Amino acid sequence: MKMKIWGISNGSKGSDIQLEAISRALSQDVSYFHANLSFPWSAVAPYKIAELGVVGDKRFKPPFPDMVIACGRRAVPVARSLKRRSAGKCFTVFLQNPIINPKVFDFVWAPAHDLVTGPNVATTILGPHGLTHDILKSEAASWQKRLSPSIINGKIVGILIGGPNKYYDFDKLEMQNLASNLLMLAQQGHRLIISLSSRSRDDYVNILRKTLADHDYYLWHGKGDNPYKAILGIADHLIVTGDSVNMIGEACFPGVPVQVYFLRGHSRRFNRFYEHLLAGNYVKPFEGILESWDNEPRNATDDIV
């Protein structure tokens, strides 16, 4: 029998990625929704009173699915409401830290750095994603001539750059320091393939172009097709800025050495995440020197499923 799943997210890109990765691995019959709670219910999610914000939402009516997978704080009231209205027949799954008691759900996955515990809780160091080795291989093949058109003496180094968030300023000075470190790699004959994210500041592009002006490199900064997956598939080595748990998790999937360019800032959650990564030899810091070691593909999606 085919399992029907409803996937409910808070609408953030990171939550959508994790939700789709798990739900699609479980079933092909999935319908996706954003919680879309209005004020004041959005402000009091994930607490029980926020279920009032789901009343009257005509999207969530019988027949109910076999499973509800929710991701993100604002998706909690929707999942709770569906469990109650289905008389418990919907198996409810929550991804990330529910903030409330995990026993409200049938199953909870949370990242280890969130310190969520319970008999129905599973944790992993990395988060789920929808990448597969076949996807990376296909993307790498289609981008090969654009990303690395000629024979090089060094390695193909993929650089994944994020941007500021509420924990890290990732200012001009830090970007200049990263660019200077990348220059050292270019001078050693390595091929640099750089991808910026939607959070990257506009001045990052100018800093990179000015610093690397005398060297051959590839830079994607939001225009045209995104080579992100191709970079993961083609790189011999990956460097990732330390502002995104999801981006670091995806970088750990191919099985090549991953180094993190750590940023100034403070977050207990991020710090615990980094401690787990370093202790498990998932990554090493990047300070201008490539470090090689035998890494292995890491895939939390399979573990969670």
What are these regions (language model features)?
Residues K103-D171, F286, L290-E296:
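A nucleotide-sugar donor-handling region in carbohydrate enzymes
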Residues F33, A110, L192-S198, Q259-F262:
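Short internal beta-strands
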Residues E275-V305:
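Leloir-type glycosyltransferase catalytic cores
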Residues G233-A235, F253-P257:
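Conserved donor-binding/catalytic loop of nucleotide-activated donor transferases
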Residues G7-H129:
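Active-site and donor-binding regions of nucleotide-sugar-utilizing enzymes
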Residues K2-W6:
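Extreme N-terminal starter segment of soluble prokaryotic enzymes
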Residues L208-N246:
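Donor nucleotide-activated moiety binding/catalytic core segment of transferases
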Residues P164-S195:
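Conserved catalytic-core segment of nucleotide-activated headgroup transferases in glycan assembly
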